[in-house]
Amino acid sequence: VPESFQKLIRDCKIGNVILFRRNIQSAEQLRELCVFLHCLISLETGLPPMILLDEEGGTVSRLGELGSVSPSAMAQGAAGDPENAFQVGRMLGQELRAVGVNFNCAPILDCNTNPKNPVIGVRSFGGDPEKVADFGAAYARGLREAGVIACGKHFPGHGDTETDSHLGLPVVN
């Protein structure tokens, strides 16, 4: 961890950190990084830190080959049983906890309602709001059972846009 970032944590009392693929080299390195951050943040703030990762499973996996291959949310939704989403959430949660991550930026709670949407697609449990809610809640329960906080995303309606939100501002009419 760069000294400049450690100083930022000390001076600004930063309590939460999000990690990206570029921060991950191996399971052992990630575990050591999370332990270091946990100790530093706890010491400097007196609070337990949240160490975040964006690990949806399916096509969005920051763990990459370090984690298990899991079905996309759309595949889970197509299978028709929210228990599958619970099991995937729990499995991913266990893998995240094993390396020290305690907060997951998942599941996707948006509905995939526009076939021209370049972002949501198979990352959504489907196009029906009730189905997406049921599967998303099951996935989140699986994460929680593994000791990981779930954070549903994206902004409601994103699944009905035609713009990649990483490249431009999506608009829903």
Protein language model regions, located:
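Enzymes and membrane/adaptor proteins characterized by extended Gly/Ser/Thr/Asp/Glu-rich
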Residues: 12-132, 154, 159-173
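Preference for extracellular/luminal or secreted protein segments
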Residues: 1-15
